[in-house]
UniProtKB/Swiss-Prot annotation:
Positions contributing to a divalent metal cation binding: 56, 58, 62, 91
Native species: Acinetobacter baylyi (strain ATCC 33305 / BD413 / ADP1)
EC number: 3.5.1.19
Gene3D superfamilies the UniProt entry points to: Isochorismatase-like (3.40.50.850)
Disrupted-gene phenotype: The nadB-pncA double mutant can grow only in a minimal medium supplemented with niacin (nicotinamide or nicotinic acid).
Cross-referenced Pfam families: Isochorismatase
Cofactors (names): a divalent metal cation
Encoding gene (name): pncA
Protein name, per record: Nicotinamidase
Pathways per UniProt: Cofactor biosynthesis; nicotinate biosynthesis; nicotinate from nicotinamide: step 1/1
InterPro entries reported in the protein's UniProt record: Isochorismatase-like_dom, Isochorismatase-like_sf, Isochorismatase_Nicotinamidase
GO-annotated biological processes: pyridine nucleotide biosynthetic process
Family named by the database record: Belongs to the isochorismatase family.
Length: 214
């Protein structure tokens, strides 16, 4: 059993990214082994007074779904007005079991759930900013209003939504940490290595849960 090393300071928040049925085994966009990180996330949650959860929440006709583009297959890439877009299998559709938070996730003190990807024509990876890089979720203001200047990020997937969230946190002036053993990656065509290059270049720091738990 893991024991707490110490309660994180009041200026720290835990951001839990997309720990949903759709991204865990049996889901429509399952990441291998993603359910295995949930016990660690639950333990980390007991160390923080401020916890934010993100939830992918797509309409059935979302622009990122390959099924909505004639002749396209999942994991093809298309160009949209805001840049390249990976096409995904339909996943985390609003109101479906696939979109629900994983039942093993146990974070009773979580204060805020941010639903993202609900705009039909814009994808959303980051907890802070939509993929068009103009539309804010309001999370940066929410955290700063509460005196938060440091965020620890966990969840799914390391190379997409976790990475975009961590980079945008750093851009927002927050100290940004990714807890590597509380995340799982898709790692598609070198995407994990590329994501870490981008994160480190943006000032994101990588740590282990052992830095918080013993």
């Amino acid at each position: 059993m893991l024991e707490l090393r110490m309660k994180q300071a009041n200026n720290c928040a835990l951001i839990v990214v997309d720990v949903q049925n759709g991204f865990t085994p049996g889901g429509n966009l399952a990441v291998a082994g993603a359910d295995q990180i949930i016990p660690c996330i639950n333990q980390l949650g007991t160390c923080f007074d401020t916890i934010v959860i993100t939830q992918d929440w797509h309409p059935h006709n979302h622009i990122s779904f390959a099924s909505n583009h004639l002749g396209k297959q999942p994991f093809d890439t298309i160009q949209l007005p805001y840049g390249p877009q990976v096409l995904w299998p339909s996943h985390c559709v609003q109101g479906t079991q696939d979109a629900e938070l994983h039942p093993a996730l146990d974070l009773p003190t979580a204060q805020l759930i941010i639903r993202k990807g609900f705009h039909r024509n814009i994808d959303s990876y980051s907890a802070f900013m939509e993929a068009d890089r103009h539309t804010s979720t309001g999370l940066a203001g929410y955290l700063k209003e509460r005196g938060i200047d440091t965020v620890y990020i966990v969840g799914i997937a390391t190379d997409f939504c976790v990475a975009w969230t961590a980079i945008d946190a750093s851009k927002a002036g927050l100290n940004s940490y990714v807890i590597i053993d509380a995340c799982k990656a898709i790692d598609m065509n070198g995407s994990l290595q590329h994501a870490w290059q981008e994160m480190l270049a943006s000032g994101v720091q990588r740590i282990s849960s052992r830095n918080i738990l013993v």
